[in-house]
A protein has these predicted regions:
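Membrane-integrated ABC transporters
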Residues: 1-32, 39, 47-62, 72, ...
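An intracellular "coupling" helix at the cytosolic face of ABC transporter transmembrane type-1 domains
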Residues: 8, 13-16, 101-105, 121-130, ...
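Transmembrane helices of ABC transporter permease
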Residues: 13, 17-30, 41, 65, ...
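Hydrophobic alpha-helical transmembrane bundles that constitute the permease/transmembrane domains
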Residues: 26-34, 67-74, 126-129, 133-145, ...
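Hydrophobic/aromatic residues in alpha-helical transmembrane segments
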Residues: 35, 39, 76, 80, ...
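Short intracellular "coupling" helices and adjacent cytoplasmic loop segments at the cytosolic face
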Residues: 49-50, 85, 93-117, 121-123, ...
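Helix-loop-helix
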Residues: 51-57, 146, 150-164, 234-308, ...
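ABC-type nucleotide-binding domain
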Residues: 327-582
Length: 582
């Protein structure tokens, strides 16, 4: 319940709607509870005495009560809808804002599919609980209390008969709720698994088709889908037991009341109208119990979803800006001072160990190393995407932890290995680098990244619409747009994480020449090709998370065995500039 209370804090703007809705339900209930008394009087007085005017009068009163109940019910629906869906929107907004604050290490705690489920399905479960349960949870207790009170007012002896049945029904329903509660938690985890399989299958659909793995993916989906179906059936099997339990107790109570009431009528101790009105209250009280039981079932499932949502909201943000953090990076120097890093505190081995190096402002630095040598990990510490486990990273002479995160990351642009472009126009994507960039600045960056070569051939140019994942562009075109996006910004440091792997050597050479013209920008280039870094000011060789050697191309080629091996393997059949000999 603490999780639900936590989520209720997001209902603040809609508390007035909830209060109005609750009041309207109570008013509606009062009108409905007054009707059985009118029925009793109509039968015992009007019908028994043949008093037609009295029958008409009571009939009109019943109609007025029914109409008032209808009007208040309609008004309730208006306020309830606004409160329910507004509250859900606030929860989704809070989740999304929290996720935007996550560091990479926070995101490592959740699967992407799980986060999507928590923002959509779990919030919908909460909304369904409120939309389907708010009215019964308000109406049920009031019907129960007032119904029992009025039934005692009409006939205390009969009231004791069905009052004995009420605790029995409550006990049975509580057993069902306790049984179903853990099943709903398991059910939501199954939904996570299903969404994960669907997401992976759709994201990698081209690989699935290329390797003819359609049947394998279908089997994997069918397995998870079958597990979800089985869990749903088992949960539903227990959840629906509340209906037969309710009906069994209700019909037993009615039979007993008819038996005792019939005897009382025969003995002239009870009027027929009183018994009819009394049965109406019995039905209302039993229905109120059923309403409350259904609400508890809804609440049981929503509590599982609420816990999953609160896990997202209460995730401790690992990386935060310091109070009064430095808001400007004055120059692009980078220094690693005895830096070690591991992704998890409990990990036994470090991804980076005792890294010490200096990069001067305006320098161009290449980083080479084998697969798994932690090249990407190294550069991710510069914009503080992760914090070091030991040691200090400095940018512009200051510890990166002293900077305001937004200011630091504005000054350090990374072109990632994976080309990330969004649905929208080319212009909209490029303006991520600088939202105020003019078309002239955009085209200048495109020319530097050689993206103008294909944009000029597109009829709509910068207004060309990119499909989801930019699937209407080639790999090389995506890379060049990502490079252009980074160049549009006013970054002091540019980091290229193997960002020219999909372009040909001639295009890469043009891009390198354009970057060389940016004298005041520090360039760090992770590459697999020696030709991409051989003309840089210095080359850093990483081996198993450690700095093996730092030097220029000539120095490393002269006496470093690792560099010599990389160079020799890539330059067979080519000249020193990387051009293939024919």
């Amino acid at each position: 319940m603490n999780d639900m209370k936590r989520l209720l804090s997001y209902a603040g703007p809609y508390k007035r709607d909830m209060i109005f809705g609750a009041v309207l339900v109570l008013v509606e209930t009062c009108f409905e509870l007054f009707i059985p008394i009118l029925i009793s009087n109509l039968i015992d007085i009007g019908v028994a005495n043949g008093d037609i005017p009295y029958i008409y009068r009571k009939g009109i009163q019943m109609g007025v009560c029914a109409l008032c109940a209808l009007v208040t019910g309609i008004l309730y629906a208006h306020f309830a809808a606004r409160a329910t869906y507004g509250w859900g929107a606030e929860i989704r907004k809070a989740e999304y804002e929290k996720m935007q604050q996550y560091a990479f290490s926070n995101l490592d705690h959740f699967a992407v599919s799980s986060l999507i489920t928590r923002m959509t399905t779990d919030v919908t479960v909460i909304q369904n609980m409120v939309s389907a349960g708010f009215r019964p949870i308000t109406r049920g207790p009031s019907l129960l209390i007032m119904g029992i009170g009025l039934s005692f007012y009409m006939n205390p002896r009969l009231a004791f008969v069905f009052l004995v049945c009420t605790p029995l029904l409550g006990f049975i329903l509580s057993l069902i709720v306790r049984r179903v509660a853990p099943m709903y938690t398991k059910l939501q985890s199954m939904v996570d698994r299903l969404n994960n399989v669907v997401q992976e299958g759709l994201t990698a659909i081209r690989a699935v088709k290329a390797f003819v793995r359609d049947e394998y993916e279908e089997d994997k989906f069918n397995e998870v889908n079958t597990d979800l179906t089985a869990a749903s059936e088992q949960t539903f099997h227990y959840a629906v037991l509340n209906l037969p339990a309710f009906q069994g107790v209700m019909y037993t109570a009615i039979v007993l009341i008819l038996w005792f009431g019939g005897n009382m009528i025969l003995k002239k101790q009870l009027a027929v109208g009183n018994l009819t009105g009394f049965l109406s209250y019995v039905m209302q009280v039993m229905n109120s119990m059923m309403m409350i039981a259904n609400v508890f079932l809804l609440l049981t499932r929503s509590m599982a979803s609420a816990h999953r949502i609160v896990e997202v909201l209460d995730e401790k943000i690992v990386l935060t800006s310091p109070e009064n953090g430095v808001t400007e990076v004055t120059e692009g120097s980078v220094e690693f001072d005895n830096v070690s890093f591991k992704y998890k505190e409990e990990a036994k081995e470090y991804a980076l160990s005792d890294v010490t190096l200096k990069i001067k402002a305006g320098q161009t630095v290449g980083i080479l190393g084998g697969t798994g040598s932690s090249k990407t990990t190294l550069v991710q510490l510069i914009p503080r995407l992760y914090d070091t486990s030991r040691g200090t990273v400095r940018v512009g002479g200051k510890d990166v932890r002293a900077y305001d995160l937004a200011a630091l990351r504005d000054a350090v642009n990374i072109i990632l290995q994976k080309n990330v472009l969004f649905s929208g126009t080319v212009r909209e994507n490029l303006k991520w680098g600088n939202v105020d960039a003019s078309d002239e600045e955009i085209w200048e960056a495109c020319r530097a990244a050689c993206a103008d070569e294909f944009l000029n051939r597109m009829p709509d140019g910068l207004d060309t619409v990119l499909e989801q994942g930019a699937s209407n562009l080639s790999g090389g075109q995506k890379q060049r747009l990502c490079i252009a996006r980074a160049l549009i910004g006013k970054a002091k440091i540019l980091i290229f994480d193997d960002s020219t792997s999909a372009v040909d050597t001639a295009t890469e050479k043009k891009i390198r020449e354009a970057l060389a013209a940016r004298k005041n920008v520090t360039k760090t280039i992770i590459a697999q090709r020696v030709t991409s870094v051989m003309n840089t000011d210095q080359i850093i060789i990483l081996d198993d998370g450690k700095v093996h050697r730092i030097g220029t191309h000539a120095e490393l080629l002269a006496d470093d065995p690792i560099y010599q091996e990389i160079y020799a393997s890539q330059m067979k059949g080519g000249d020193e500039n990387g051009s293939e000999s024919l």
